[in-house]
């Protein structure tokens, strides 16, 4: 009986170790030709790793019609215990496409965002649309006013990101004041620490 308990405990520990090792690799995707594979557009109602906690990503373009307009792209997935996503897409639009996309984004029902994760009023770029959640993070679009639109997202839970996000995304693509580090003040406030 005692031996069975020890074997059971060892098996449980082995499984936990395997889960931790297998699920903790940061996955980086930068081939824009596979863009839709990493978006939640097609994973609604499914148990896909790309469902992104149900956050609405419709701010991002549903498809990219001209890959040559994309100047930068990166999507990161990390799941040490809970899934986390960090991504950005930078598109330099033609004048007509830019005007059309600006119109689409300005009609998006943006949410309040100021105060979540120390975010302040966006002043680095013009904020075109934002979907903010006090627990899950942000999906948004910014513009420099010169035909360039930056789509970005930081989606996570537990009030912090395990990803060293500043290593993977330009800080000017983050909303002004964004702080989702382990010891961020917003987390302390929400956890009553």
Q: Language model features by range: what are they?
A:
Residues 1-9:
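Positively charged n-region of N-terminal signal peptides that target proteins for export
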Residues 8, 96-100:
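A beta-rich soluble binding module of mature secreted/lumenal proteins
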Residues 9, 32, 59, 64-70, ...:
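Extended aliphatic helical segments
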Residues 10-15:
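Hydrophobic membrane-insertion alpha-helices, especially the h-region
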Residues 17-21:
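C-terminal motif of bacterial Sec signal peptides marking the signal peptidase cleavage site
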Residues 22-97:
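N-terminal export/targeting and maturation segments
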Residues 101-193:
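Extracytoplasmic electrostatic interaction patches
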């Amino acid at each position: 009986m005692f031996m069975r308990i020890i074997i059971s405990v060892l098996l449980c520990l082995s499984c936990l170790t395997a889960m931790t090792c297998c699920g903790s690799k940061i996955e980086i995707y930068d081939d824009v030709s596979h863009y839709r594979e990493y978006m939640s557009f097609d994973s609604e109602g499914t148990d896909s790793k790309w469902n992104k906690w149900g956050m609405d990503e419709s701010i991002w373009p549903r498809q990219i019609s001209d890959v040559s307009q994309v100047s930068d792209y990166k999507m990161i997935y990390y799941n040490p215990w809970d899934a986390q996503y960090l991504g950005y897409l930078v598109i330099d639009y033609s004048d007509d496409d830019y005007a059309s996309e600006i119109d689409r984004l300005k009609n998006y029902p943006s949410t309040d965002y100021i105060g979540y994760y120390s975010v302040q009023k966006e002043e680095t770029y013009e904020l075109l649309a934002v979907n903010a959640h006090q627990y899950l993070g942000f999906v948004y679009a910014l513009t420099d006013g010169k035909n360039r639109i930056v789509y970005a997202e930081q989606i996570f839970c537990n009030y912090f990101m395990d990803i060293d996000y500043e290593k993977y995304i330009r800080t000017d693509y983050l909303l002004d004041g964004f702080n989702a580090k382990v010891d961020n003040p917003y987390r302390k406030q929400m956890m009553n620490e």
